[in-house]
């Protein structure tokens, strides 16, 4: 049986209420300094720096400049006066982040270059070599910057959900089940036949089909949880899921 795992962030909850998310904590700070909001925005930044880096690269900046831009942008985001500038009408972190970066590129970057980047601190751990390799591997040559951003955002969500899912199988003592069946959710290489998986795992084909069903179901739940952390309302969640699905399929 696939592991259940913890589900502390599942949204909405059975009562119909929409639970607190990282982004709602930031918006609800209401322009005031909040240690809880700082932690929340830093978690979001650490999770989603790469789509922004890819966007900056696609805007024409080289690897080193894109890293500098991304670091300096987040140095300003994770700052004590950040919350006073958050527009509460921006219901989705993805939309807000792209708009904030465009403003930074247009109005703040030249000023930032005259100062020491991020006060000399690396706030978000960026692996420049890994980021560049990923960018070169995944980027479609004719993609517009905004399309690159949304594509990489969607891929990051899927990767985070898959990482959490594998961790749950490891915790349950069955990593081999995930490793054998992951192609059924990855959309990459062709998955094995049920018969092949049954032989590899020592199960019946019927048991493999059930395991794949549970794997897909839990993966979809985790994707929903990841998206939920970047929005504030059930409507935003459903709209964002639909939009990202079109991005993945495009």
Regions found by a protein language model. Name each.
Residues 1-250:
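Intrinsic, short, N-terminal disordered tails of RNA polymerase sigma-factor systems
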């Amino acid at each position: 049986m696939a592991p259940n795992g913890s589900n502390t962030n599942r949204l909405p909850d059975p009562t119909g209420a929409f639970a607190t998310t990282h982004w709602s904590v930031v918006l609800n700070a209401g322009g005031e300094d909040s240690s809880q909001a700082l932690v929340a925005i830093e978690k979001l930044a650490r999770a989603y720096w790469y789509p922004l880096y890819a966007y900056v690269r696609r805007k024409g900046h080289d690897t080193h400049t894109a890293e500098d831009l991304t670091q300096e942008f987040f140095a300003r985001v994770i700052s004590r006066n950040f919350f006073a500038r958050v527009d509460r009408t921006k219901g989705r972190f993805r939309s807000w982040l792209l708009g904030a970066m465009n403003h930074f590129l247009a109005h703040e970057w030249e000023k930032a270059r005259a100062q020491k980047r991020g006060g000399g601190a690396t706030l978000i751990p960026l692996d420049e070599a890994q980021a560049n390799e990923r960018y070169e591997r995944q980027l479609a040559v004719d993609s517009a910057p905004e399309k690159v951003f949304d594509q990489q955002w969607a891929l990051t969500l899927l990767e985070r959900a898959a990482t959490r899912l594998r961790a749950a199988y490891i915790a349950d003592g069955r990593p081999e089940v995930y490793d054998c069946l992951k192609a059924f959710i990855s959309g990459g290489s062709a998955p094995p036949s049920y018969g092949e998986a049954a032989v590899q795992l020592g199960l019946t084909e019927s048991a493999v089909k059930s395991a794949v069903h549970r794997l897909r179901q839990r993966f979809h739940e985790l994707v929903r949880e990841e998206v939920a952390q970047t929005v504030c309302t059930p409507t935003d969640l459903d709209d964002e899921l639909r939009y990202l699905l079109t991005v993945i399929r495009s």
